[in-house]
């Protein structure tokens, strides 16, 4: 099923006799109405049948002008009746920017959230935790309302810095996996090439120290030699996997969901390799006290979502619910 021709209409009110007329904001205030606009779409359904492994497409069916919901209209916005004309019962000094729900004027309060698509390194002070430092990133595509995905790279907390392993936590996985196996699943099979993604490549003492720290992580991923073996290894730790699911489906799931939802803001595996190396580089520099840790409470690591992103996210959630019901 495809959704086409999305249209947002003007606010209308329907009387008891069936007559509809354009609603003004003041009318919605006086009559305790909600100042809403209808969302109308066309549904295009296509049926496919499988004939001995050959997919055959049957005729398409288009259902036009389907009402799927309503959305609050902000006063003086593009879809508001005051956008074109100022009615006599409206104040000319009212700049709008609010909605009217059941006759009451409502505003949407901006919400604070952590920044997306920027890696941050924090120290884990919990004594029971086996990882001392974590590089965390919350990713989402730009101008997209899909659910943010969290990925982390962690280092164990042994006293000797050269006896620690690096592990990665990915979306849809129930357990961390070795760092170098992730690199190999993304297409980088040579250990030297992987190290070059991580270090500064300036021949400094810091590069030498980072390579020594990576030594155990290199050994941990040495049993995996091909990209397929790396993906097969990751498929063993899929969330909610059942014993009835075939290995082929698990491998397909890793390719289409696990690796795709890792660093979702990046377009391809090559850019993910570079960015993963950057995350490891930052984690190890914080671990070695070369650069400071990030401050969770600093406003440079936060963003404020105003009404546009908040309404967009809510609309996306409601639309997903509709598609699942269909």
Residues of each region from the PLM?
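N-terminal non-catalytic structural scaffold regions of very large proteins
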Residues: 1-326
